[in-house]
């Protein structure tokens, strides 16, 4: 075992040279998969098994909101020039808003059923998507919905800054005692974008509480091991709040996050040769894409925060982008055990977009 460990730790990293052209081809193909498999209602093809050439049953509205977010991100980078992407994002957003449930305190959140629970993550990523839509279009028609989603998220927040995972329409209240390792970071980014859209309304206060919780207590309280939990949503939030005046403990958390994401890329890049015996299969597209999202968001923080020491974020980001692009199938999807989900394409697209933006910045302050 000791010999195996030595071989693994000493294994060389395999990182082909990054080409933004290759990344863009993969981004476009992944987006095309989402667009061409979308139903007229706006619902995405959620899960597909290529062995039987058939969709699998079930649907996840949080991932629907995430897929919509990714399309809006791409549309912003493309400056709205690809109408198919924009129209698919709009259909996806309409699907969410048609399922909005009124909650307490003037809030709202989408649910698969009017009698079903509202998930904090769905509301948060719907808010993120609407914020991106507002940036893309300048259209203010959904400002009321954005604020209602924000009120819902604030109502889900606990005194320690963490977020409850569900709101129950039967009781008209949050479901007590159940948190989510994803929802807290998702909510922080949504509320941060809401503050950026409407400064002076107080939406930054819950964001500060969440950032303090993430930076200090979350991993231990929620028993997430090893710390820090590789939370790309937290990374997005840190990048979004770089001009807010982050405190030292927030930056220390960012450094730990960057180290974790970088370690994950390095480990994957060492899976060639004899080191293969110590590695599990490459993560699915969704999992790998979140690493790139996290690194890209943190690089933005690094470029704009002089208190942070230099770190090889761009190198890790580009290494991961090459490996992710190479893992894409000919139909534009990322498969794991011959199955793919919409969030595989979502996170891969968003992660590769982060690498593309990083390459264009060239490691320089924008």
Give residue spans per PLM region:
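Glycan-recognition and catalytic cores of secretory/periplasmic carbohydrate-active enzymes
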Residues: 1-366
């Amino acid at each position: 075992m000791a010999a195996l460990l030595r071989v693994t730790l000493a294994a060389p990293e395999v990182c082909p040279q990054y080409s933004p052209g290759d990344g863009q081809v993969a981004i476009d193909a992944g987006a095309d998969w989402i667009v061409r498999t979308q139903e007229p209602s706006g619902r995405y093809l959620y899960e597909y098994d290529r062995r039987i050439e058939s969709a699998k049953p079930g649907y996840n509205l949080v991932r629907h909101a995430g897929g919509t977010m990714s399309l809006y991100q791409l549309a912003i980078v493309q400056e709205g020039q690809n109408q198919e992407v924009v129209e698919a994002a709009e259909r996806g957003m309409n699907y969410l808003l048609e399922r909005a449930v009124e909650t307490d305190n003037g809030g709202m959140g989408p649910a698969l059923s009017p009698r079903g629970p509202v998930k904090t993550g769905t509301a948060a990523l719907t808010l993120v998507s609407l914020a991106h839509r507002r940036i893309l279009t300048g259209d203010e028609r959904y400002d009321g919905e954005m604020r209602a989603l924000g009120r819902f998220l604030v109502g889900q927040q606990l005194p320690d800054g963490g977020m409850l995972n569900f709101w129950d329409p039967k009781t008209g209240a949050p479901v007590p005692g159940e948190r989510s390792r994803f929802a807290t970071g998702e909510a922080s980014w949504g509320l941060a974008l809401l503050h950026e859209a409407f400064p002076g309304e107080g939406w930054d206060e819950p964001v500060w509480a969440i950032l303090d919780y993430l930076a200090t207590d979350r991993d231990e309280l929620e028993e997430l091991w090893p710390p820090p939990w590789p939370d790309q949503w937290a990374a997005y939030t840190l990048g979004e709040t770089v001009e807010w005046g982050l405190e030292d403990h927030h930056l220390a958390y960012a450094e730990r996050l960057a180290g974790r994401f970088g370690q994950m890329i390095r480990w994957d890049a060492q899976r060639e040769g004899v080191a293969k015996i110590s590695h599990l299969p490459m993560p699915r597209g969704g999992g790998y894409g979140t690493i790139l999202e996290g690194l890209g968001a943190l690089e933005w923080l690094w470029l704009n925060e002089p208190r942070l020491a230099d770190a090889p974020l761009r190198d890790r980001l580009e290494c991961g982008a090459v490996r992710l692009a190479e893992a894409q199938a000919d139909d534009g999807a990322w498969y794991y055990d011959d199955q793919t989900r919409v969030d595989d394409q979502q996170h891969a697209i968003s992660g590769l977009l982060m690498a593309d933006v990083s390459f264009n910045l060239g490691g320089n302050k924008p």
